[in-house]
Amino acid sequence: MNMYQLLERTAQTYPDNLYLVREGVKYKDFVDLVKARAASLDKAGIKKGDVVGILSHNIPEFPISLFAIWYLGGTVLLLDTNLTPFEYENMTATTKCKIVCAEKSFFFKTDKFTFYDITKKDGKINPDLKPAAVESLDYATLSFTSGSTGKPKVVPLTHFNMVECTNSLESMAEWIRPGDYLYGFLPMYHVFGFGVEILATLHFGAGVLLQPTVNPKEIMADFKKFRPQIIPAVPRLWEVFRNKIIDNVKAQKKWWLVSFILKYGKTLQKIGLGALVRKVQKPILDVFGGRARLLIAGGAATKPEVETFYERLGLTFIQGYGLTETVGPICISKPTKKRFPFAFGAPTLNNECEIRDKNEDGVGVLWLRGHQVFGGYLDNEEANKEIFDERGFFNTGDMVTMDKNGELHFAGRKKQVIVLDSGKNVYPDELEGMYIVLPGVKNVAVFEHKVKGKTVTYGVFSVEEGMTLEKLGAEIAAANKKVASYKWVTHFAMTTEDLPLTSTQKVKHHVVRQNLVEGKYPDRHE
């Protein structure tokens, strides 16, 4: 089965369920919209095997175009909306993408590929245009996981990978039901947003309420009007919501009562005071529309106190673990079990794990194998040899432990990928390659660091004599313009000493970071 066939199956099973909630589009009507878009893209010259980019916010035309490209047998290149023209040109060149479906606001002059207005109105369905014969192992999507410059890592996911991911989501059937509304403000180009807003809704016959911007006023208005049952978000947003709720309650001078209910609510329910508990909880739950049943966190670790807050309000709060290489959620937590520190459950259906090279605390490297695990980076045999063993297990590079219940607990990242508070990933290799060529720079280490309690992308530069912070800052700022702003190094230190290296001449990032903490690099811009 391929992804378009899966859509047709869901539309036949739940024809009158809303898929695009805000627009009032039912599943049966969504299929017609996909067919009409497929006819338009066919006229534009797209054929089976072509790579077609999508560069768009969360608007209805995103999923319509996605399934239309699959209808024609194409592969979708998912493009981050926060990048630069330079990066888009590199990505399309690497993947041989000749056409990009985009909102007009993203258009720029280029001879590398052609833009197609994703909001363009479609004509009639072409009855002679049938779905392409797409095999389960054909590529469905391509995504970049290591930046667009240098030797990029492009993740191809097959239709088999995605269909199996939807099947594995059956483990969430206790909380997601046909006809539910899922709030969709996570970007669909990212694997977390794609997994919940495309795959999960498709599996359960649920609807998605697309929100193209993260505007608090619009989000609150949507919660009130549409009252979604399922709300996924990155941990940072769950923390923001929690803090605002607490601030509002304190402003009403009711925190003493709410904190008492949060602490003793379960006990009060057991002794017959459930009505009181619900009365206190109701105004808070109404913030989410009053029907919220399931809150989902992913993309980074959630603070225990944040998760506890929502669970004590009577909401189910689950966390997942996944990578682009695993179609997102390959592990899902069980809300009935104690999961601190951050735990993300066990592998889902038809997936398995091994923890290797454990230390004395039981912390080891997580390896995964299964139906959701991709087959290797596109045209990058060197990288593939490093991450797959002879038995087909994939090295995630993440450090975990396993508890007595078989649940995995996140212990840290062996890889140096920087995870910002927003959940966005920054790849040090890409930035180091960009900064190492700057005048006066001998070497550089980029890593995750805390500045005034905030996670930032930090750089330590080994420079030649005579370099000043002001001059280095100007060089860095000029280089930053090549990449998206969330990747920028704006906090840095410099030294005229050489950075510590391994025997293979690689920078020892952990030593550099420790030196920074110990104050060995006093020349800083923070």
Across the structure, where does each feature detected by a protein language model lie?
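AMP-binding/adenylate-forming catalytic core of the ANL superfamily
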Residues: 100, 370, 375-376, 399-485
